[in-house]
A protein has these predicted regions:
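Class I S-adenosyl-L-methionine
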Residues: 159-209
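Conserved class I S-adenosyl-L-methionine
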Residues: 122, 149-165
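A short glycine-rich, Lys/Arg-flanked "PGG" loop and its adjoining helix->strand segment in the class I
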Residues: 128-142
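A short acidic, Gly/Pro-enriched loop at the edge of an enzyme's catalytic core
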Residues: 99-108
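Conserved beta-strand signature within the Rossmann-like core of class I S-adenosyl-L-methionine
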Residues: 142-150
Length: 209
């Protein structure tokens, strides 16, 4: 972490950061109001999450990321814009979902470009597994959306099979199909680089009925 990123923690964590407690969290209290909550897991450098919170003030945004420099960058960006609808956690996302997020509490969950763990022997480390998807589905409100995106075709195939097999979720594109990129996901720097290298991108948008 750079000195500037450490200063961001020191200056802005009290305003935007939520420390993991391992007990049910009142999201309305955390944000100071009652509004739909969008969760982004693994927000990287925070570029997308910052833009989403800035451009969509009617909803609240919670980001979870374990990478310190990315958290520091997002804290600086949020403070520079004076955002009030953004909160950040630096902890394992599965533990946060399991221990702190109530059933039906989320309007949307976004997992964009998670680590594909491309070697076969590492596939078990992939975040998107049946137990994870079932947990996320239980935290979505009726009509809530789970949106995944990846630029790794093998992982996309795996994701599609796992999501389509979850009885609590419906594929908005139809069973066995990928979704068009929805308007709320703008292109990331990582994605632009991938496209220049000829990589495809696959979006999956499933809704809890």
């Amino acid at each position: 972490m750079t000195p500037a990123q450490q200063r961001a923690f020191d200056a802005h964590w009290a305003r935007y950061g939520l420390d993991y407690a391992g007990t049910p969290r009142d999201l309305a209290q955390a944000f100071g109001r009652s509004a739909p909550v969008v969760l982004e897991i693994g927000f990287g450098n925070g570029e997308q999450l910052h833009a989403a919170a800035r451009d969509d003030p009617a909803r609240d945004y919670l980001g979870i990321e374990v990478h310190g420099p990315g958290v520091g960058r997002l804290l600086n960006a949020a403070a520079a814009d004076g955002l009030s609808n953004l909160r950040v956690m630096r902890h394992d996302a599965v533990e946060v979902l399991r221990e702190e997020i109530a059933a039906g509490a989320l309007a949307q969950v976004r997992v964009w470009f998670p680590d594909p763990w491309h070697k076969t022997r590492h596939h078990k480390r992939r975040l998107v597994q049946p137990a994870f998807v079932a947990l996320v589905a239980s935290r979505l409100a009726p009509g809530g959306v789970l949106h995944l995106a990846t630029d790794w075709q093998d992982y996309a195939t795996h994701m599609l099979a796992v999501l389509d097999a979850c009885p609590a979720l419906r594929n908005t594109a139809g069973a066995g199909r990928y979704a068009p990129c929805p308007p709320w996901r703008s292109e990331t720097r990582f994605e632009r680089r991938g496209r220049r290298l000829g990589h495809g991108v696959w979006d999956l948008v499933h809704v809890r009925d």
